[in-house]
């Protein structure tokens, strides 16, 4: 074996074991480099997600004595696909043509895959149509099929699926998983039925997609259990992918007993299994159990760390999420855009502007600022911290804005009372070809409510129902009631609540009635407030909010006895008002304050300052007549 072959094999072995830095040292120390050695290093970077390193290495390869071949191009196109960088991908395609590899089957398949993952179906289809019919294989067809499914162009995908000269099981899975990703359970089940009637049998990936489709909505619990039963019958219950999807299904539904039973039944634990267990524990609120599993995991990759950071953030422990992010950076694990997005969401929950800006600087250095997931988190962070200019700038930096990007910026403008900017943004969103969803209209209606735009709000509400046929939800009704309530239109607010009473009452979320009761308190309408309170007592007999609002209403109108009676009833029912909580970041340190708490180390100094402020506020000379 020659020295060149031996060293190239060593690079591959080191990279496969995760020792990529050592692999690069061997690569840099080689006396000569052929194309195979370059490809081995390039492929290693691409597979490990080190995309910037892969791009830099490919650039070096272009100007070296060794020239890129079809394996080089497939590796760098895979990097472009993972980054979603269609602009760089087009440059690679131009280089492919100039280098004479435009007839290479692996390269063309990689081009279709790259364009598909970047949602550029026109370019993917052009590459496909430019290929000779005889040169296409199953991978070619499946890559084009995935491109259309990824872009949610279901009719075009179906045309490709029907046109395929020879279907394979993977094509069925692409169709099912694509519909599952969009929550189209009926389509998934219909395709699954057709698959059972064909020559192909479902595998663990098929069942995994079906379980994921059932996980999208709690109303699908019956279908989920049925799919699980079929999975057991077909002998796929022990497969890692299927097992993880079942675990995810039960945790998303909040079925703690079923989730724990699935956890205990896992015998062979892969890296994916460890991550799934941690995720499952976090989703059911078992943060201590998740931490225990984290420490037991033999290997901790970027997904493991990100799952912990995300889990702590969702469970309201943003400080612990930040600590884990710092520990991850110290451990030497290369962070990705998902990790940055997760820790930014944690900063948003705590309104930590200083920490968020430092993390923003780090992710710019790593080249992640253009990712939609990161950009959305940045917009949310700056908006919650009151810096709307930075939020708008972060929105502008997002390369490929998705629906979440537009919705997040829409909410940001709305919360800050910038109704004109919010409505203009909505117009730009429609002009960009982005279809609004239920969340979009919650943001629009909230904006109109906070800005007193009653007429515009009514038009938007009507457009949502008639033009876009979006199913009405409790949150939409609540926004409308809040809008009418803030404007003093209590009669209209009551009519709306009465009209949609079945929707409002049948939901476990009684925010609509609570909003109406709050409006009654604001405008001192005791009679309507008492009427609404009766509805809330029937719907939520153990919920203290309706009692607190009614008591405040009585007290605000000087009816102290009735207010005291309501408070007494709360005591008799064993209810307690949830104490208020606030926090502030000063000098990169977070201080938290809870009503009645006296544990803060600077309590005496803070009390003196508050007393001084209260004295000045009550002094008529402070503000003048």
Curated annotation (Swiss-Prot):
The record's annotation in InterPro entries points to: E_motif, Pentatricopeptide_rpt, PPR_At4g14850-like_plant, TPR-like_helical_dom_sf
Q: Which Gene3D superfamilies match?
A: Tetratricopeptide repeat domain (1.25.40.10)
Tell me where in or outside the cell this protein is found. Mitochondrion
Which keywords label this protein? Mitochondrion, Repeat, Transit peptide
Chain positions covered by the region annotation Type E motif: 512-587
> Segment Type E(+) motif: which positions?
588-618
Q: Which family does it belong to?
A: Belongs to the PPR family. PCMP-E subfamily.
What does the record give under GO molecular function?
A: RNA binding
Its GO CC terms are: mitochondrion
What is the transit peptide's residue range?
1-7
This chain's protein is named Pentatricopeptide repeat-containing protein At2g36980, mitochondrial
GO BP annotation list: RNA modification
PPR repeat ranges are: 3-33, 34-68, 69-103, 104-134, 137-167, 168-202, 203-238, 239-269, 270-300, 301-335, 336-370, 371-401, 402-436, 437-471, 473-503
């Amino acid at each position: 074996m020659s020295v060149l072959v031996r060293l190239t094999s060593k690079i591959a072995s080191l990279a496969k074991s995760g020792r990529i830095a050592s692999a690069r040292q061997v690569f840099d120390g080689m006396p000569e480099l052929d194309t195979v050695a370059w490809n081995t290093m390039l492929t290693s970077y691409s597979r490990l997600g080190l995309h910037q390193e892969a791009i830099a290495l490919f650039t070096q390869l272009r100007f070296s004595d060794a020239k890129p071949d079809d394996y080089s191009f497939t590796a760098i196109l895979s990097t472009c696909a993972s980054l979603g960088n269609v602009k760089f991908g087009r440059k690679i395609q131009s280089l492919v043509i100039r280098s004479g590899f435009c007839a290479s089957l692996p390269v063309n398949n990689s081009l279709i895959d790259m364009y598909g993952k970047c949602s550029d179906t026109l370019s993917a289809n052009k590459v496909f149509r430019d290929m000779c019919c005889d040169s296409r294989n199953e991978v070619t067809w499946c890559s084009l099929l995935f491109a259309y499914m990824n872009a949610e162009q279901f009719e075009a995908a179906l045309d490709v699926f029907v046109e395929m000269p020879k279907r394979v099981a993977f094509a069925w899975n692409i169709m099912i998983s694509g519909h599952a990703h969009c929550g189209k359970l009926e389509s998934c089940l219909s395709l699954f039925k057709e698959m059972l009637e064909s020559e192909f049998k479902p595998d663990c990936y098929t069942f995994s997609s079906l379980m994921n489709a059932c996980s999208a909505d709690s109303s699908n619990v019956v279908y989920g259990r049925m799919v699980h039963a079929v999975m057991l019958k077909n002998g796929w219950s022990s497969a890692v992918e299927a097992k993880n999807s079942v675990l995810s299904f039960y945790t998303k539904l909040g079925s703690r007993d079923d989730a724990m039973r699935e956890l205990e039944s896992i015998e062979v634990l892969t890296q994916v299994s460890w991550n799934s267990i941690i995720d499952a524990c976090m989703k059911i609120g078992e943060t201590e159990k998740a931490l225990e599993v984290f420490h037991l995991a033999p290997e901790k990759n970027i997904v493991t760390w990100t799952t912990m950071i995300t889990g702590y953030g969702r469970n309201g422990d943003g400080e612990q999420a930040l600590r884990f992010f710092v520990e991850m950076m110290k451990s030497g694990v290369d962070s990705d855009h998902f990790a940055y997005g997760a820790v930014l969401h944690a900063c948003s929950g705590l309104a930590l502007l200083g920490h968020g800006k430092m993390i923003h600087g780090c992710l710019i250095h790593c080249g992640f600022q253009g990712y939609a997931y990161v950009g959305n988190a940045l917009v949310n962070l700056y908006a919650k911290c009151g810096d709307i200019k930075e939020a708008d700038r972060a929105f502008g930096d997002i390369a490929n804005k998705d629906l979440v990007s537009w919705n997040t910026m829409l909410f940001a403008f709305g919360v800050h009372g910038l109704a004109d900017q919010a409505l203009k943004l909505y117009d730009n969103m429609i002009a960009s070809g982005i279809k609004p969803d239920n969340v979009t209209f919650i943001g629009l209606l909230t904006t109109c409510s906070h800005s007193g735009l009653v007429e515009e709000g009514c038009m938007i509400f009507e457009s949502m129902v008639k033009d876009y046929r979006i199913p009405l939800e409790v949150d939409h009704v609540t926004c409308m009631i809040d809008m009418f309530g803030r404007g003093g239109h209590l009669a209209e607010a009551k009519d709306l609540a009465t009209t949609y009473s079945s929707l409002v009452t049948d939901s476990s979320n009684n925010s609509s009635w609570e909003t109406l009761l709050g409006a009654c308190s604001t405008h001192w309408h005791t009679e309507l407030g008492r009427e609404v309170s009766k509805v809330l007592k029937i719907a939520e007999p153990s919920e203290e909010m309706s009692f607190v609002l009614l008591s405040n209403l009585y007290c605000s109108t000087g009816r102290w006895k009735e207010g005291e009676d309501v408070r007494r009833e709360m005591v008799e029912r064993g209810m307690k008002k949830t104490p208020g909580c606030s926090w502030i970041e000063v000098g990169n340190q977070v201080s938290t304050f809870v009503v009645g708490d006296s544990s803060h180390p600077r309590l005496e100094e803070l009390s003196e300052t508050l007393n001084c402020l209260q004295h000045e506020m009550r002094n008529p000379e402070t503000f003048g007549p």
